Structure formats: structure tokens, C-alpha cells
Amino acid sequence: MFTTVRPEQKPINPFIPYDLFTAIDELKRELNAVILAHYYQDPDIQDIADYIGDSLGLSQQAAATSADVIVFAGVHFMAETAKILNPDKLVLLPDLNAGCSLADSCPPQEFAQFKAKYPDHLVVSYINCSAEIKAMSDIICTSSNAVKIVNQIPEDQPIIFAPDRNLGRYVMEQTGRDLVLWQGSCIVHETFSEKKIIQLLMEYPKAEFIAHPECEPSVLRHASYIGSTTALLTYSQKSGSDTFIVATEPGIIHQMQKEAPNKRFIPAPAMNNCLCNECPHMRLNTLEKLYLAMKNKSPEITLPEHIRVAALLPIERMLEMSK
């Protein structure tokens, strides 16, 4: 006698309301909370956020907010930045495991030893780094303002640039400066296949290939436009082209499609037939986790005060130099 085994069904979480959008809106009013979301978040999180942006825009919003609670739909270093700027506010990250491969590629102890080899160098650190690395830096930058920041530093001042080597190379090309680079990288932006991108450009000869500067030089050399996520979004709206191959995390395509619904956006392919160009850390955040974080006021981002204070100054320098 045979019996049919039914597939195991996951029980419905009784603590999750059916209408999450309404429940989150109610909690937002109750807590006087603001939801900040990065472009790489899932579309449903982007749609409920009060502000969607790149690292620079999110930092500016975090610095300016009057909310009592900041819910950061992004990764750990972004929520840390919000806490550095707002020590008296409650900063929530829906999933504390939402880390960053680029930030992880620059361990504080190793970077301290690296920095000690260049005592006369100014340290410019990409915002995609831990609070400890920010605390060891002189100025923070983002992909939106890295070139602008470096151009404001006297030419006779030697510079360490950390942690992203690809962004560092791009800044060197744009500024003509010789930077000492920390050899870190982002797993997402290093997975794009030059060969497959060339094939796509042959398949879509009228398409524009646009790319984030965290991509490798072999990929960037084919791009008709290179810029931060916000810059890519703006360019795709203003360009006369109607088809784009986009080399960055594909979460940005949700906003591109909303802003230009009649245009076509094709995610740049990865080396393997996988979703490797989706950031696994960004995708840990879900609408359900966002709701529970607000309801439970946890997980909360906390920092040792001496680290926070030391990290604040280079961020404030960036915000001032970005005006």
C-alpha cells in the first residue's frame, strides 16, 4: 500500500498582517519613523520607502531627517552611517545579517597596518566600509562624489583610497591622480561577463551600455556612460536611447522602468548562468522583516561612542565638500 506524501507547507506567520503596506504606514505614523531604502532593495520595499537613493542621497537624508526612528532598508554600513549621524535616534536594520562583501574585504586591523605604511597620506574611504574604517579615514566619499572629493584635495597631498580598487582606478583615470589603492571589491560588480556584454551589444546594436564604476576595467571600457546608481538613473531618463544594458545590481531597474516606462532595461549578464548580479546581502531584507523591525523596535544599530565620534568627522567633511 502506497501513501501520498503531501509537500510540507509553511505555516502562515500569525504575527504578520495580511496588508503589510497599511500596517507599515500605521507603524510609521505611530513611531514618527522614516523609511530609507537603497536602489538595490526589492521593488516592494522601494515602493513603501519615504526616500529611495544611493549612498550619498541616503546619507544626506539621514543627516536631515526630523524623524525619531530611522528604518534603513539597505545593508549594515548604511545603517551604521545613519547612526553615526543620528546618535540619539533609533536606527533599525530589518536584517542584521545584511552585510557587504566590499566592506568585509577591508578588515580594520589589516587596514590599520596598511595605513601605517603611508603616514603622510590622506585617507579617502568609499562609504561602503565599516564604521571602524570610517573612523580611520580623513574623508568619506561615495561613487557619486568620489571624483569631486579627490579633485578638491591639493595635488601635492598623497592619498590612500579604500576599499574599492575598481572605483579607485576610475577616480585615478578621471582625476589624473596617483592613488594608493586598498585591494577590495564588490562581488556583484565583479561578476559581469565582458564576453556576454559584447554579445548583448551585438544583439542590440542600438542599446547603450551603462555601468557603475565598481565594475572591472574590462567591463567599463565598453560603457557609453559610467556613473553612480543615481547618475545611471538620471542618464537613462535623459538619453534619447530606448534600450539600455545596465551593469549594476538590477534592483535599480525598478526605478528606471518607473521613470521611463517606454524604455527597455536589460540587466548585464554575469559570468555564470545565475543571479550573481543580485546582491545577496541587500536581498536579505524583506517587507515582512521591515514590518517586524518596526513593530519590535529591533534589530537596532548601536556603535561604541568613540568609534561613532571618530567616524562622524570624515562623513561631515564629505557632506560639506559635496555641496
Curated annotation (Swiss-Prot):
The EC number(s) this enzyme carries: 2.5.1.72
Cofactor(s) needed by this chain: [4Fe-4S] cluster
GO CC terms of this entry: cytosol
InterPro entries: NadA, NadA_sf, Quinolinate_synth_type2
Known catalytic reactions: iminosuccinate + dihydroxyacetone phosphate = quinolinate + phosphate + 2 H2O + H(+)
Record-linked SUPFAM superfamilies: NadA-like (SSF142754)
Sequence positions that bind iminosuccinate: 38, 55, 126-128, 143, 212-214, 229
EC class: transferase
Keywords on record: 4Fe-4S, Cytoplasm, Iron, Iron-sulfur, Metal-binding, Pyridine nucleotide biosynthesis, Transferase
Cell location: Cytoplasm
Function: Catalyzes the condensation of iminoaspartate with dihydroxyacetone phosphate to form quinolinate.
Family classification: Belongs to the quinolinate synthase family. Type 2 subfamily.
Full protein name: Quinolinate synthase
Species whose genome carries this gene: Gloeothece citriformis (strain PCC 7424)
